[in-house]
Amino acid sequence: MAKMMQREITKTTVNVAKMVMVDGEVQVEQLPSETFVGNLSMEQAQWRMKRKYKGEPVQVVSVEPNTEVYELPVEKFLEVATVRVEKEDSEEQVAE
């Protein structure tokens, strides 16, 4: 049996709506859901949606975080992963 690597990942599905004028009345138009890696708050999701739909009146309706455990055989991980190179102290100081 192959050795497996496991990682718990949280993704957040953001449901968003847009306000539109139809015959002089404001109506809500549901937009496609967006999924982001991480556990986003309503405020974080609203900020991201405002950036995506610049200038449009959008409102986040709900955020739905979902955490799942993913696994991958170690051999496959080694095929696709890259070796992390540690930065030297002088490089880190310049970056700051």
From Swiss-Prot:
**Sorted alphabetically, which keywords does the UniProt record give?**
DNA condensation, DNA replication, DNA-binding, Early protein, Repressor, Transcription, Transcription regulation, Viral DNA replication
Q: What free text does the record give on domains? A: The N-terminus is involved in DNA-binding.
GO biological process terms, alphabetically, are: chromosome condensation; DNA replication; viral DNA genome replication
UniProt GO molecular function: DNA binding
Residue intervals annotated as DNA-binding region are 1-19
**Coiled-coil annotated residue ranges, if any:** none
Summarize the protein's role. Histone-like nucleoprotein that binds to the viral dsDNA and responsible for wrapping and compacting the viral DNA about 4-fold. Forms a nucleoprotein complex in which the DNA adopts a right-handed toroidal conformation winding around a protein core. Binds ito most, if not all, the viral genome, although with different affinity, the highest one corresponding to the genome ends. The formation of the nucleoprotein complex at the genome ends, activates the initiation of viral DNA replication. The binding of p6 would recruit the complex formed by the TP and the DNA polymerase to the origin.
Q: What's this protein's name?
A: Histone-like protein p6
Instruction: Give the family this protein belongs to, as stated in its UniProt record.
Output: Belongs to the phi29likevirus histone-like protein p6 family.
The record, for Pfam families, names: p6
Lineage of the organism: Viruses, Duplodnaviria, Heunggongvirae, Uroviricota, Caudoviricetes
* Subunit annotation: Homodimer. Homomultimer. Binds to double-stranded DNA giving rise to multimeric nucleoprotein complexes. Binding specificity for the viral DNA is based on supercoiling, the viral genome having a negative superhelicity lower than that of plasmid DNA. Interacts with the DNA replication protein p17; this interaction optimizes the binding of protein p6 at the viral DNA ends, thus favoring the initiation of replication.
